[in-house]
Amino acid sequence: MDRVVLMLSVMSLGVSSQPITDGQRLFSIAVSRVQHLHLLAQRLFSDFESSLQTEEQRQLNKIFLQDFCNSDYIISPIDKHETQRSSVLKLLSISYRLVESWEFPSRSLSGGSAPRNQISPKLSELKTGIHLLIRANEDGAEIFPDSSALQLAPYGNYYQSLGTDESLRRTYELLACFKKDMHKVETYLTVAKCRLSPEANCTL
């Protein structure tokens, strides 16, 4: 009897439940992918720090705290309270811009190991997934009226020939910013996904 009631309940939802199910599935995939990238970013940054002398770590961290990531030019919530107040569409849009801003710089993170070579393709997959989520919520044309405006300049002169100290600083900056941005995207997508469950507690 319970099984029959359950089947009738599912059937009564009809087609209207399908978009929610699809949305949850897409969000789950996107969150899983950005979690993988965030963990990878943390590992790469930790490995790089471990290769430095204590004084080098201290100096580089001091410089980085006074510097900015390229993605800081992308307007995003300033704290967890603003993040929670932001709409799903806004969080998706910001996440898309953050991921897109790494398409070119991520090439310098590739090479040397299998995990590093996963970065660019994983970013591309994540970008596609977020775009699908945006289109499921609203016409993508309204979110990205001018895609050229989303392109940020490469990270300083990272791609030029640099001295040892400057090269260390650029590598530190690149890895630290990548870790920071993947954490942002993970947070935004997790909150947006939570909004699909009205009874869920989305407190950060």
Swiss-Prot record:
Modified residues (Pyrrolidone carboxylic acid): 18
GO cellular component, one term: extracellular space
SS bond list: 69-177, 194-202
Pfam families, alphabetized: Hormone_1
Signal peptide (UniProt feature, chain positions): 1-17
Record-listed Zn(2+) binding positions: 36, 186
Keywords assigned by UniProt, alphabetized: Disulfide bond, Hormone, Metal-binding, Pyrrolidone carboxylic acid, Secreted, Signal, Zinc
Subcellular location, record wording: Secreted
Biological processes, Gene Ontology terms: animal organ development; growth hormone receptor signaling pathway; positive regulation of growth; positive regulation of receptor signaling pathway via JAK-STAT; response to nutrient levels
Key word Translocase present: no
Recorded superkingdom: Eukaryota
Cited InterPro entries: 4_helix_cytokine-like_core, Somatotropin, Somatotropin/Prolactin, Somatotropin_CS
GO molecular function, one term: growth hormone activity
Family stated for the protein in its record: Belongs to the somatotropin/prolactin family.
Protein task: Growth hormone plays an important role in growth control and is involved in the regulation of several anabolic processes. Implicated as an osmoregulatory substance important for seawater adaptation.
Name of protein: Somatotropin
